[in-house]
């Protein structure tokens, strides 16, 4: 069983612009979730969304900035709804844009509940990167 979500997207924007969408709280909220993010290693913050009681999710994702290498890498912890994982965004200039790789790792491949959560989040990450992030970048 797999224990990670991996997505890959090409965005027709420079890495610095994509980086801002990942690290400026207002831009991050516009494509992901409301948050109190600060781009400081060690900073603890939350993302907030609608609770999903059936999955034991209170609507709060508790995070901490683990690694910050502007404008090429952001890694955070991601805990909520019974999972304790990490999310890493890697950015690389490519042609007239940016290649954005997302890795959401640390799921228990043997736990059916975590596998279900991983499937839900996998679809969400794909949709957010493909549509919502691109819309935020186009509008900012």
Range-by-range predicted roles:
Residues 22, 32, 78, 137:
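Short, flexible helix/strand-to-coil boundary loops that buttress conserved ligand/catalytic motifs
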Residues 18, 28, 45-47, 65, ...:
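Hydrophobic pocket/interface hotspot
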Residues 36, 52-101, 105-108:
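Hydrophobic-ligand binding "helix-grip"
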Residues 21-22, 68:
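Conserved catalytic core of Hanks-type protein kinase domains
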Residues 6-7, 17, 25-60, 73:
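Short beta-edge strand/loop motif at the mouth of beta-sheet-based domains
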Residues 1-15:
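Terminal, regulation- and interaction-focused segments at domain boundaries
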């Amino acid at each position: 069983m797999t224990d990670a979500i991996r997505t890959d997207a090409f965005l027709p924007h420079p890495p610095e612009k994509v980086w801002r969408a990942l690290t400026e709280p207002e831009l991050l909220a516009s494509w992901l979730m409301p948050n109190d993010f600060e781009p400081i290693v060690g900073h603890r913050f939350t993302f907030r969304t609608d609770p999903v009681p059936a999955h034991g999710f209170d609507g709060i994702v508790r995070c901490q900035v683990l690694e910050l290498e502007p404008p090429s890498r952001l890694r955070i912890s991601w805990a909520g709804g019974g999972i304790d994982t990490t999310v890493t965004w890697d950015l690389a200039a490519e042609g007239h844009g940016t290649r954005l790789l997302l890795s959401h790792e640390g799921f228990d491949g043997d736990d059916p509940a975590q596998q279900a959560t991983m499937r839900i989040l996998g679809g969400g990450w794909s949709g957010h990167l493909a549509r919502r992030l691109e819309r935020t970048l186009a509008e900012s």
